[in-house]
């Protein structure tokens, strides 16, 4: 009996994968609790300078840094820039809020700066079901950018996906 091999349609498809996990910060997500240097809820410049001076900056390499606890202390406007400049060259993003909030802002900035031309006219699969907690807002932002350049956008995996967008004329 001579059986023909079963074709692997997924491998043979012209789908181009777009994986938001490729943008996940290599150093992960790190948090700095503002209450650590704010006795009685008051942040003083001298305390912050001391904190920054003793900060082991290498531990923030390639990470997204969340400045948490802003609702528990009085936050001067210079605080974010002071910590961000101290971590420049180490952290990829510094922002105020919880990990999900700051991660959403990081993805928004990163995706806004991405080069989408590689997906022009392509059938793109926006991959889901990853190992990291990529924010839902990142999926929406990626779909928005992809719909501007791609022929077709789908969400999920190659073997099981949800059609999201199809350009006119296709």
Where are these regions (language model features)?
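N-terminal, charge-rich interaction modules
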Residues: 1-80, 84, 90-93, 150-152, ...
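Extended, charge-rich low-complexity interaction segments
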Residues: 116-140
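Short, aromatic/basic amphipathic alpha-helical patches
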Residues: 80-86, 137-146
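A domain-level signal for the structural core that forms small-molecule/cofactor-binding pockets
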Residues: 52-53, 112, 137, 145
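Short, flexible, solvent-exposed loop/turn segments with mixed acidic/basic and small polar residues
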Residues: 56-58, 115-118
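Gly/Ser/Thr-rich loops at beta-strand to alpha-helix junctions
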Residues: 70-77, 129-137, 160-161
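Short glycine-rich or small-residue beta-strand-to-loop segments that form or flank ligand, phosphate
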Residues: 64-70, 95-97, 123-129
């Amino acid at each position: 009996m001579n059986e023909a091999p079963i074709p692997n349609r997924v491998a043979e498809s012209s789908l181009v994968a777009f994986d938001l996990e490729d943008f996940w910060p290599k150093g992960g997500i790190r948090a700095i609790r503002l209450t650590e240097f704010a006795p009685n809820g008051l942040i003083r410049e001298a305390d912050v300078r001391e904190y920054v001076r003793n900060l082991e900056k290498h531990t923030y390499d390639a990470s997204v840094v969340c400045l948490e606890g802003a609702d528990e202390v009085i936050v001067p406007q210079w605080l974010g820039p002071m910590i961000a400049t101290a971590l420049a060259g180490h952290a990829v993003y510094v922002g105020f809020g919880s990990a999900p909030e700051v991660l959403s802002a990081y993805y928004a900035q990163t995706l806004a700066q991405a080069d989408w031309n590689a997906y022009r006219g392509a059938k793109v699969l926006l991959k889901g079901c990853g190992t990291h907690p990529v924010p839902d807002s990142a999926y929406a932002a990626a779909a928005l950018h992809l719909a501007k350049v791609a022929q077709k956008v789908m969400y999920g995996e190659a073997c099981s996906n949800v059609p999201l967008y199809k350009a006119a004329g296709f």
